[in-house]
Amino acid sequence: MESFATSDKLFESREFVKGLEELKKRREDGEMTCDLLWRMCRFCHELSTTMSGEQRRKMLIEGRDYGLEAMDLDPSSFLAAKWTAIMFGLVVDQLPTKEKINDGGRLKDMLDKALELDPTDFALLHLRARFSYTIANLSWLERKAASMLYSEVPKATIDDALVDFKAAYNQNADWIENLLFLSKCHLAKKEKQQAREMLNKAIVLPAASSNDAQFVTECKSLLQKC
């Protein structure tokens, strides 16, 4: 089997387009392995961060589908489980509330499975926390509408979200997005001092991307409410 040294080097050097093209060529030539597919999923994730709108949506779906194929080939692969859950979550995040709830149970199962394989992965902890945060913030009307369409509406609380956001923080204390959502949980619980602490940490961190810059702006806005 051909190694992934070249594609991994392209990933490390952030040559994501070239790396994905190389792996697609290998797939077209008949290679179909879990290790190939989760790497394709990972490249799609990185490329999606440079896109917006419909282009980003299509890239997320493409990556999610590679991940699902990888999981079918090897359900015990942590990296396949991790990247599939991440991409599945990003796709679900773009759906309207009803569809988001419908796919939420499947996403939660994916996250739980991946975290069983590695309970310390901060990206997965953050994503599961985001799921809990979203469910906890559904309005009564949204829950009622969902219960009429689906057999079971997922249950989660702000405290559930806070546990996972804190666990992610313990693994990566300088993640602006996680600090933002930690502060939102504390604000929801009327814990303004803890929220201020997280927000003040976030606004002095360097923004590594345009998304980070937006999160910093939101953190500064939330500070006004503390």
Swiss-Prot record:
Source species: Caenorhabditis elegans
Question: Mind telling me which InterPro entries this protein's record contains?
Answer: RMD1-3_a_helical_rpt (IPR049039), TPR-like_helical_dom_sf (IPR011990)
One MF term from GO for this chain?
microtubule binding
Q: Which UniProt keywords apply?
A: Cell cycle, Cell division, Chromosome partition, Cytoplasm, Cytoskeleton, Microtubule, Mitosis
Instruction: Indicate where this protein resides in the cell.
Output: Cytoplasm, Cytoskeleton, Spindle pole
Asked if the Swiss-Prot or TrEMBL record annotates the protein with the keyword Cytoplasm, the reply is: yes
Q: Sum up the protein's function in the record's words.
A: Acts in chromosome segregation and organization during mitosis.
Which gene is transcribed and translated to give this protein?
A: rmd-1
Matching Gene3D superfamilies: Tetratricopeptide repeat domain
Task: Please name every pair of cysteines joined by a disulfide bond in this record.
Answer: none
Q: Please report the name of this protein according to its UniProt entry.
A: Regulator of microtubule dynamics protein 1
* Residues of the signal peptide: none
Origin: domain of life: Eukaryota
GO CC terms in record: cytoplasm; mitochondrion; mitotic spindle pole; spindle microtubule
Consequence of gene disruption: Defects in cytokinesis, spindle orientation, chromosome segregation, osmotic regulation and merotelic attachments of microtubules to chromosomes.
Give the main localization category: cytoplasm
Q: Which GO terms describe its biological process?
A: attachment of mitotic spindle microtubules to kinetochore; cell division; mitotic spindle organization
Among its keywords, does the record have Cytoplasm?
A: yes
| Family affiliation | Belongs to the FAM82/RMD family.
